[in-house]
Swiss-Prot record:
This is Procollagen-lysine,2-oxoglutarate 5-dioxygenase 2. GO terms for biological process: cellular response to hormone stimulus; collagen fibril organization; hydroxylysine biosynthetic process; response to hypoxia. It is a peripheral membrane protein. The gene is Plod2. Residues 1-25 form the signal peptide. Keywords: Dioxygenase, Endoplasmic reticulum, Glycoprotein, Iron, Membrane, Metal-binding, Oxidoreductase, Phosphoprotein, Signal, Vitamin C. Residues 644-737 form the Fe2OG dioxygenase domain. Forms hydroxylysine residues in -Xaa-Lys-Gly- sequences in collagens. These hydroxylysines serve as sites of attachment for carbohydrate units and are essential for the stability of the intermolecular collagen cross-links. Coiled coil: none annotated. It holds the Pfam family GT_PLOD. It comes from Rattus norvegicus (Rat).
Length: 737
């Protein structure tokens, strides 16, 4: 038979024995679990940016051991986002693996770092790797790149993703070393293509025992998979779940254009925010200004780019910020001639406390983008400028600690959440549409409504934000940050920040203020804010309703100087003054004539020298004012009566000795009447008042901003008492005629 025949004769019984043993269920011994200290994470980062620090923080959270290659080196691997490249990473891996090639029990995890976060720990990762029963496992992708012509060379897959993704792979050190030792290309050649060609070569794939993580048990590449993944809250933890394969990936990679989705997941994973514990990282790396002797220098950029209501209030609030004025510099761009008087009044106040003020007015004819570039550069060029705080004219900062709070959060870019009252409109977007515009993230409503509170990494913020000065002089050193393609300036800023890898945060940890609506702001009147009751009801109320109005319902401050004549505060001083100014500006007083074309029938039995609200287009505003602020008082003082809040006659009356000094006794054509004093007795006029004849009761010292409310057509016959000198103004409505 010869030696060969003898060996074959011995081998056949052994094979038969093995087959027999297998048929009896005799299995190989289960390999022991790989200890966590036998895992080494390797990544490449020639620079450190926000994405890198996020990756390292997630690794630290799970106690991964990480080795960073390429630190301090020049990146020569090309622009991987927009073209092929990345070969430098393979070259660095090749050099590093020479040190680990002989460690058979060491497992190497290579992963990107700028756009990766860990969602699970080393034990989970190693357990899933061992279950694959392969020496090297690559991330899998539904998209084939960079060479689609290689599709036919990939082995088929029954379930799962078919194509290799080089953003993450795990394997035993000797096998990883053998893999990268095959690299002999240039730094700017493509790493993805290199690994792809190794994998699709059947001999190399078998020799290195490579497989792909087809069902995303270890790696989740987000690009092309946005409809597969959701956020999962369970047992006090936050995870990313792949709903297609019912898996919980360990490493989440926001490859390609999916970085915004990764940023969204990064707000929660790993356990950055949970339903049970809220925000875990809100105070991470925060500072405390109460411990400093010298406050950081801040450039305050103020931008008025369109006619905006309530500007004096906006500007005054900036001066009430709880921050040392000697640490502030001021840059103001005002595009509107309409607001020049407001700016002048503001500067006259500010110049006593703020030493450096730069005003760029409408005469400069700067575009919004040019002005914003100039303001930001005002800080960038000053080495002493620690922060740039940009505030638009439509932001009402009601929290005086806003600036301090933002500085203490210690983020490169951070904005306070501000919203329009009663609406979901805010100064941030939680997601972007494919064309780069607004899309609503899953958590947007919860953040706006305060159901989820924290510090949120977002793709877009505007209106008000704080940027670190050192960031402007490093990552954001390009001066033309607000101009890009045909984008609006705010979108251009955010796009540039995203491309530079600078994270933008929004904070809703505090109540900071609100946004004003500039829609339908008509500047054709003298005091245009009077018309803002619909667009900006909160600001309208703050400016025009008496501060003591709420005490009507809490402290019972309503007075009753005559039977069923109720007296209560309603208007602020400013409301009274502006209403009088508006009427005098219009100037067409009726003259107290009986013949009056403004009313039905054309005849007034008891005429007054007046101007109707309808004449100055204030009728709808006034009726809304009655429904919102007069009707609740009516219900309190006339229990059981529910007013419709409607009036045909709403007008301002002017009494003076020269024109009309008094008004004869009469009943009003109303169920009840309101009569609001618009100026001060003793200061603006002498005399005047109202006498209710049935009760022989007079009120001769009306209070500015206070209203009488009394029944109309039946019981309360009354007259206007003579004005001796000066001019008296009252606002009157005959309600529910």
């Amino acid at each position: 038979m010869g030696d060969r025949g003898v060996r074959l004769g011995l081998l056949m019984p052994m094979l038969a024995l093995l087959s027999w043993a297998a048929s009896l269920g005799v299995a190989e011994e289960t390999p022991s679990r790989i200890p966590a200290d036998k895992l080494l994470v390797i990544t490449v980062a020639t620079k450190e940016n926000d994405g890198f620090h996020r990756f390292m923080n997630s690794a630290k959270y799970f106690n991964y051991t990480v080795k960073v290659l390429g630190q301090g080196q020049e990146w020569r691997g090309g622009d991987g986002m927009n073209s092929i490249g990345g070969g430098q990473k393979v070259r660095l891996m090749k050099e590093a693996m020479e040190h680990y090639a002989g460690q058979d029990d060491l497992v190497i995890l290579f992963t990107e770092c700028f756009d990766v976060i860990f969602a699970g720990g080393p034990e989970e990762l190693l357990k899933k790797f061992q279950k694959t029963n392969h020496k090297i496992v690559f991330a899998a992708d539904a998209l084939l790149w960079p060479d689609k012509r290689l599709a036919d060379k990939y082995p088929g897959v029954h379930i799962g993703k078919r194509y290799l993704n080089s953003g993450g792979f795990i394997g035993y050190a000797p096998y990883i070393s053998r893999l990268v030792q095959q690299w002999n290309l240039q730094d700017n050649d493509d790493d993805q293509l290199f690994y792809t060609k190794v994998y699709i070569d059947p001999l190399k794939r078998e020799a290195l025992n490579i497989t792909l993580d087809h069902r995303c048990k270890i790696f989740q590449a987000l690009n092309g998979a946005t409809d597969e993944v959701v956020l999962k809250f369970e047992n006090g933890k936050s995870r990313v779940k792949n709903t297609f394969y019912e898996t919980l990936p360990v490493a989440i990679n926001g490859n390609g254009p999916s970085k915004i989705l990764l940023n969204y997941f990064g707000n929660y994973v790993p356990n950055s925010w949970t339903q049970e514990n809220g925000c875990a990282l809100c105070d991470f790396d925060a500072s405390d200004l109460s411990t400093v002797d010298v406050y950081p220098k801040v450039t305050l950029g103020v931008f008025i780019e369109q006619p905006t209501p309530f500007q004096p209030r906006f500007l005054d609030l900036l001066l009430t910020l709880d921050y040392p004025k000697e640490a502030l510099r001021l840059f103001v761009h005002n595009k509107e001639v309409y607001h020049e008087k407001d700016i002048k009044a503001f500067v006259d106040k500010a110049k006593h406390d703020i030493s450096s003020i730069k005003i760029v007015g409408p005469e400069e004819n700067l575009s919004q983008a040019e002005a914003r570039n100039m303001g930001m550069d005002f800080c960038r060029q000053d080495e002493k400028c620690d922060y740039y705080f940009s505030v638009d004219a439509d932001v009402v900062l009601t929290n005086p600690r806003t600036l301090k709070i933002l500085i203490e959060q210690n983020r490169k870019i951070i904005a306070p959440l501000v919203t329009r009252h009663g609406k979901l409109w805010s100064n941030f977007w939680g997601a972007l549409s494919p064309d780069g515009y607004y899309a609503r993230s899953e958590d947007y409503v919860d953040i706006v409504q305060g159901n989820r509170v924290g510090i949120w990494n977002v793709p877009y913020m505007a209106n008000v934000y704080l940027i670190q000065g050192k960031t402007l002089r490093s990552e954001m050193s390009e001066r033309n940050y607000f101009v890009r393609d045909k984008l609006d300036p705010d979108m251009s800023l955010c796009r540039n920040a995203r491309d530079m890898g600078v994270f933008m945060y929004i904070s809703n940890r505090h109540e900071f203020g609100r946004l004003i609506s500039t829609a339908n702001y008509n500047t054709s009147h003298l005091n245009n804010d009077l018309w803002q009751i619909f667009e900006n009801p909160v600001d309208w109320k703050e400016k025009y309703i008496n501060r003591d109005y709420s005490k009507i319902f809490t402290e019972n401050i309503v007075e009753q100087p005559c039977p069923d004549v109720f007296w209560f505060p309603i208007f602020s001083e400013r409301a009274c003054d502006e209403l009088v100014e508006e009427m005098e500006h219009y100037g067409k007083w009726s003259g107290g004539k009986h013949h009056d074309s403004r009313i039905s029938g054309g005849y007034e039995n008891v005429p007054t020298d007046d101007i109707h609200m309808k004449q100055i287009d204030l009728e709808n505003v006034w009726l809304h004012f009655i429904r919102e602020f007069i009707a609740p008082v009516t219900l309190k003082v006339f229990a059981g009566y529910y007013t419709k809040g409607f009036a045909l006659l709403n007008f301002v009356v002017k009494y003076s000795p020269e024109r009309q000094r008094s008004l004869r006794p009469h009943h009003d054509a109303s169920t009840f009447t309101i009569n609001i004093a618009l100026n001060n007795v003793g200061e603006d006029f002498q005399g005047g008042g109202c006498k209710f004849l049935r009760y022989n009761c007079s009120i001769e010292s009306p209070r500015k901003g206070w209203s009488f409310m009394h029944p109309g057509r039946l019981t309360h016959l009354h007259e206007g008492l003579p004005v001796k000198n000066g001019t008296r103004y009252i606002a009157v409505s005959f309600i529910d005629p």
